[in-house]
């Protein structure tokens, strides 16, 4: 016997379905559901008088060893670079077990996820599920960054540093085995995945390679240590030998060479360019031109994203502090001024929107905000839709799915791919580590509802602990059980090089966290940057700083009002 109800009534009970669209926060972005893997009339819903009860939606005969998940997130909308769908998402042993239809196959049709005695349930009706974000430009200055990043939806942090030293405030580098080992020990306490970058400065391959054997998953080249052709070449020699990544902040002052000299030193080898627009550092004024090369994996950092009326004004003081410059020295002020170019900053949002820039990241506490990678990525997407209209791929579809998939890839799968960890994290796909973020649509990209690490709940919005129910005010972010005790070791990954794992670093340091290797990096090209692999000719005019893409000028207007801003925050 069939039963009909309106789409509105169905969505209020079970969440939206195929053809429905969800507005993301207060933006002009609409996610249209492409397919629904659940079955109408057979939805698995938990609660009093609902479906997931023994002998109904739950199979009470099957034990955990009989292909039963540990957790099911029911009827949730999955937004991922792979697509936008509605499904039940099953987690087992800390990994995504299956994306499909949950329930009891004895009484329900189409079930490929069997809810059993061992299964917990999170209600995903009316909510959005994404992969945990990956911030690949972290200055490890303060450990307080970690929780700030986590509650913004970031579950993996890659970068370098040792604390509030002057070099860490300026450069994302953890130099040498002793510092690397101490940072790896410290990371054991936090429900976050980590990867470290060693110092990419030296003329000796063995001296730099020992950092990889010690546990770094790559090397970082930074102009404050000297971004010379020699350092670039030596770092890439190490990277090619050990299958790790090199990240680079190029030479703003053009002291050791111009952008053409850096390109020659790179010599076609894959490299991850940080803040490729240049305000965060890099050859002035034309570092952008590297983004046309097929071996360059270009990223932006978030202080210039999106372009607003305040962007230029805040950058000078920010830059002086971060790079240990003296405002009383004219040469230091000139150095800072050379980075801050309205024309290239105005082009940056457009290059992101066109898929020419592939990633976003923070540059945490060093000209970037660690808790705003997700937020600012979506603000750029909204700004570009308002100024440039729908992407050609979205014309006539009733949604913005291609643009949404492009932008979510910028802080999930693409940084994971660039650093050789996409086999473990970076997307909502079966077999991957269950780093998942649950959002209410009205708070999407701004304030997550619940953060899962390795399938464990580690943080989320919770009400007064003394209340009789979980929801009374004040509601704020509180740690969950997965963030305490030895559960942290099972909920999070420490990424190491293959050489470090073979050298026994986890055993030597007594690491308890899950250890995974970085791999398959040196064969990457920009074509591997999902939905963000465009390589058109780029040119920056050396006099006017105008940016041209395939001969056409690109720019945008500074925004005066943004979504996902004062409507959601007091400060």
UniProtKB/Swiss-Prot annotation:
Modified residues annotated as N6-carboxylysine in this record: 220
Pathway terms, separated by semicolons: Nitrogen metabolism; urea degradation; CO(2) and NH(3) from urea (urease route): step 1/1
Pfam families attached to this UniProt entry: Amidohydro_1, Urease_alpha
Residues annotated to bind Ni(2+) 2: 220, 249, 275
Ranges where the Urease domain occurs: 132-571
GO molecular function: nickel cation binding; urease activity
A biological-process GO annotation: urea catabolic process
Chief site of localization: cytoplasm
Annotated InterPro entries: Amidohydro-rel (IPR006680), Metal-dep_hydrolase_composite (IPR011059), Metal_Hydrolase (IPR032466), Urease_alpha_N_dom (IPR011612), Urease_alpha_subunit (IPR050112), Urease_AS (IPR017950), Urease_asu (IPR005848), Urease_asu_c (IPR017951)
E.C. number(s) listed in UniProt: 3.5.1.5
Record note on cofactor: Binds 2 nickel ions per subunit.
GO cellular component terms, A-Z: cytoplasm
Subunit structure: Heterotrimer of UreA (gamma), UreB (beta) and UreC (alpha) subunits. Three heterotrimers associate to form the active enzyme.
Name this polypeptide is given: Urease subunit alpha
Source organism of the structure: Kocuria rhizophila (strain ATCC 9341 / DSM 348 / NBRC 103217 / DC2201)
Gene designation: ureC
